[in-house]
Amino acid sequence: MSRKLIKYLPLLVLASSVLSGCSNNVSSIKIDRFNNISAVNGPGEEDTWASAQKQGVGTANNYVSKVWFTLANGAISEVYYPTIDTADVKEIKFIVTDGKSFVSDETKDTISKVEKFTDKSLGYKLVNTDKKGRYRITKEIFTDVKRNSLIMKAKFEALEGSIHDYKLYLAYDPHIKNQGSYNEGYVIKANNNEMLMAKRDNVYTALSSNIGWKGYSIGYYKVNDIMTDLDENKQMTKHYDSARGNIIEGAEIDLKKNSQFEIVLSFGNSEDEAVKASIETLSENYDSLKSAYIDEWEKYCNSLNNFNGKANSLYYNSMMILKASEDKTNKGAYIASLSIPWGDGQGDDNTGGYHLVWSRDLYHVANAFIAAGDVDSANRSLDYLAKVVKDNGMIPQNTWISGKPYWTGIQLDEQADPIILSYRLRRYDLYDSLVKPLADFIIKMGPKTGQERWEEIGGYSPATMAAEVAGLTCAAYIAEQNKDYESAQKYQEKADNWQKLIDNLTYTEHGPLENGQYYIRIAGLPDPNADFTISIANGGGVYDQKEIVDPSFLELVRLGVKSPDDPKILNTLRVVDSTIKVDTPKGPSWYRYNHDGYGEPSKTELYHGAGKGRLWPLLTGERGMYEIAAGKDATPYLKAMENFANEGGIISEQVWEDTGLPTDSASPLNWAHAEYVVLFPSNIEHKVLDMPDIVYKRYVAK
């Protein structure tokens, strides 16, 4: 497509590469900017994020390439740069037409299959076959280990007719710096390579192809973007080269030139950085780029414990997902998930999703690293937590990777978890900066918590009290190692006192379920037998506190605070199983609690603040850990978690009752993957590997 050039800018790039010494450096780039036809009728309609049902997630296993990608519905979904909490892309997908009679969107109109390059890498092959049997698109997706570039090699095949019967288009939806609105798009030619650029503030993206574009257009979402144009006209009729608003960048692939091609999306903090990365990545040998990406991940996996050869693909995939969830600037900041729950119904007002740091989730991730033998990663997470302790001695409910609070609830288990982790890692050097401030805060605020671990309601929670007792016991030991004997005595006395109060504060003997005796989810008053109503979040309703049960009470056993054969534990197990357990075709799982509203109302409705909570696979793992503590076999629960994983080896936050398949909740949920990683060797060794032994010895083995 011929275009008039109205701006010519020769650009000299002084830096030779992101990594010194890499090949195919570009020292001088000539940039011509097109600025002929701006899109009209902006700024475009409001957009959403992508589905949270991820088929894969990935990044280079190093601190140099700061790009993370996700896959959903057979296409690239959210991509993050330069930090793991900053999404810049909603989606990159293909659209197929015959130019006259049909339009086929690969994310809606194909059957998508995902394969890993190897069991020990986070590189993916997607095979999308048209539901009507007309075409197939095969894609390989990974990142450049030396640059801030996402690479996709694609192949289009005609299953009906010939390639010349089809037109292939690419749609790129930028959501730069967690915002879909008011992004700027424009077109340049750099060293004779046409690139679709997008920018917001100091973040730039450059989309390019090794065979160029047959045509392109930048339009406003649902006004005149490429998808709207194709729906109306079956081929590209709009040819805009700039727009500012809620934009979609579109391009036509010249199938006559080649049906197999490479697409590169590069990032930078300036236009020249993004353009340079794109040119350098395209100039590299594709197979070499792919091999380098695979080699980094395989080297990591081969460094992990393999448990005498028993380690399986889900174990390795879980460890890679956890490893990939660390920010590369703020080291040790492991987010909860590379997803936005129910993202296809969430807009710009949901900037955080689950790509934030929770102290609780990070604790479980660190325990997985310890179990797998990656103690360095666990230590980095603890060092990070020490940096986010606030002046009042507490860690926020969750934070951006910078440590800036996102939500502001106070959860005392999130204060205790880093103390337990410090004990497990023997990090007595963090006493003044982490352990003591958190322990003092727990004593000041507890045992009543502002929110329990489901982040919804305050009161006296058996799970939170288990964490408080375990945390203070560990804090007492660490205080002794630092010769702070006065604090050590204070912490241990408080732990002993609260351990004795757990039953009085959280165990009802007059409940309406089963025989009436069990640990309740949470007591709003310091009397679990009181007639006191609590409000269930997310539209769950209002109920007497004695009506609600939760598997979280098993933390009493997991953390060594109660014996697994304590009659009160056994009583509650029976009540929980009869009330909130479901046997799915893939294995058993549990609701967080009865009347939970955090989930889709139905399979045809997204969650928008009220619904029905579904089953949580991580609770299956927690039950397995209890069975091990009780001297039993956890294999059925381990297998259930394996069955809950999707084709890409990803475990979601929630699954459907009738199928055991993922809902549109967060996926992957790192907490669930961490649970699987710890359960796997615990079942082999017949021992709860993340139980703090000092707590167990004091309260159970005495």
Swiss-Prot record:
Keywords: Carbohydrate metabolism, Cell membrane, Glycosidase, Hydrolase, Lipoprotein, Membrane, Palmitate, Polysaccharide degradation, Signal. It is a lipid-anchor. A lipid is attached at residue 22 (S-diacylglycerol cysteine). GO terms for cellular component: plasma membrane. One of its GO terms (molecular function) is glycosyltransferase activity. The keyword Lipid biosynthesis does not apply. It is an enzyme of class 3 (hydrolase). Substrate binds at residue 342. It is found in: Cell membrane. Pfam families: Glucodextran_N (PF09137), Glyco_hydro_15 (PF00723). It catalyses: Hydrolysis of terminal (1->4)-linked alpha-D-glucose residues successively from non-reducing ends of the chains with release of beta-D-glucose. GO terms for biological process: polysaccharide catabolic process. InterPro entries: 6-hairpin_glycosidase_sf, 6hp_glycosidase-like_sf, Gal_mutarotase_sf_dom, GH-type_carb-bd, GH15-like, Glucoamylase_active_site, Glucoamylase_bac, Glucodextranase_N. A lipid is attached at residue 22 (N-palmitoyl cysteine). Residues 1-21 form the signal peptide. Its EC number is 3.2.1.3. High activity towards 1,6-glycosidic bonds. Belongs to the glycosyl hydrolase 15 family. CGA has typical kinetic properties for a glucoamylase, but this bacterial enzyme had higher isomaltose-hydrolyzing activity than other eukaryotic glucoamylases. This is Glucoamylase. It comes from Clostridium sp. (strain G0005).
